[in-house]
A protein has these predicted regions:
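Short, Lys/Arg-enriched, disordered terminal segments
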Residues: 1-5, 324-328
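Nucleotide-sugar donor-binding catalytic core of glycosyltransferases
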Residues: 3-60, 65-82, 89-243, 250-264, ...
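Alpha-helical elements of Rossmann-like donor-binding domains used by nucleotide-donor carbohydrate transfer enzymes
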Residues: 29, 78, 193, 282-286, ...
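Active-site/pore-lining binding-face segments in mid-to-C-terminal subdomains
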Residues: 241, 246-249, 275-276, 296-300
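A short acidic/histidine/glycine-rich donor-binding loop in glycosyltransferase catalytic cores
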Residues: 268-275
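C-terminal "capping" alpha-helix adjacent to the active site of nucleotide-linked donor transferases
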Residues: 276-295
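A charged, aromatic-enriched C-terminal amphipathic alpha-helix characteristic of glycosyltransferases
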Residues: 291-325
Length: 328
């Protein structure tokens, strides 16, 4: 019988790990999926700003942290006392890679003595912001199986509207000028250009990130109201590319030369409808003008099958365990 890997997740009480947070994908991975895997023995340490590593010396094989910094990540202790003398590998989940411009990533790597980084982002995107010497693994996760197991049938949903949800840019001139001059990497148009463009169409229904009751674990319930939905991010795919297909939506998916969405395993017109800034209106019109064509349901079902298999949290944990082994 193989010996279980002992993993200690050290964290602070924080909004990001709350059940009430508007994003619960990371919470479900770290607090649920890891716990139910038989190959690891999880130890959860809820701490204050300072944690003494000697308390777990000889009791764990891996230290796991919510992120690589505590500047904006309020789940991470300010100090791991004694970490400089510890031989326990430290693995961290990353946040948004572009946030790395807000702090010294090498300084934080030394502060927490980080050995490995993981996240859902493509490795090439990670290394746009982090040193090539940092060890990183792309690990797909985000779909908590129980939340997507039983979804409303495709034909029972709203068909004549396409759902668009999440952050968008403000198109007013003074907002655009301000964003270009002062927001830099945080300019919404850098991330959500096509998503913003879609809102001008009469058959697109838009909901903001927080402008509805379906936040956190309830997000799939919003998606299940619609037969079709838009997953569009300009520079890098997000978990909407996992969640919308998993919810059974026919997903209009932005796939361009820069956002790495082509690496997610979907096939155009088979498991998703690929769109870009040039063809999105045409693709929408093809759907809206032929709502009852059975091919839309077939594509939605194929997308759901792929998403449930590829992006579920249990598979994510299996990949994470293989990453742990590289440091043992």
């Amino acid at each position: 019988m193989n010996k279980k890997i002992r993993v200690t997740f050290i964290y602070k009480d924080c909004t990001s790990l709350s059940e009430q947070n508007y994003y619960t994908q990371h919470r479900n991975l770290l607090l649920k999926a890891l716990r139910r895997n038989d190959s690891i023995e999880m130890n959860y340490v809820l701490t204050s700003n300072i944690f003494d590593i000697d308390k777990i010396k000889g009791k764990t094989d891996i230290i796991l942290l919510y992120e690589d910094q505590n500047i904006s990540a309020n789940c991470v202790p300010d100090e791991l006392q004694g970490i400089e003398d510890s031989q326990i590998p430290v693995i961290v989940k990353i946040g948004d890679p572009w946030d790395a411009k807000k702090y010294d990533v090498k300084e934080q790597q030394e502060k927490y003595k980080i050995d490995g980084y993981f996240g859902t982002y493509d490795a090439d995107f990670f290394y746009k912001y982090y040193p090539k010497t940092f060890k990183y693994k792309r690990i797909f996760y985000g779909i908590e199986p129980s939340l997507y197991q039983n979804v409303l049938e495709y034909d029972q949903r709203i068909k004549n509207k396409i759902l668009n949800s999440g952050a968008v840019a403000n198109k007013k001139l003074h907002n655009r000028v301000f964003a270009k001059l002062f927001k830099g990497e945080e300019d919404p148009m850098r991330h959500y250009k096509l998503r913003t463009m879609c809102n001008g169409l009469p058959y697109v229904t838009y909901t903001t990130t927080l402008g509805h009751e379906y936040v956190g674990d309830k997000y799939s319930l919003l998606l299940q109201k619609y037969s079709a939905a838009i997953a569009a991010t300009t520079d890098i795919y997000t978990m909407k590319y996992f969640e919308m297909p998993a919810s059974g939506c026919l997903t209009f998916m932005e796939v361009n030369n820069d956002n790495f969405a082509k690496n997610l395993g979907y096939r155009d017109n088979e498991s998703a409808i690929f769109i870009n800034e040039k063809n999105y209106k045409q693709k929408f019109d093809e759907y809206i003008s032929d709502l009852n064509n059975p091919k839309w349901r077939q594509i939605a079902n194929a997308g759901r099958e792929h998403a449930m298999k590829t992006f579920n949290n249990d598979e994510g944990v299996n990949s994470l365990i293989e990453f742990f082994k590289e440091f043992m």
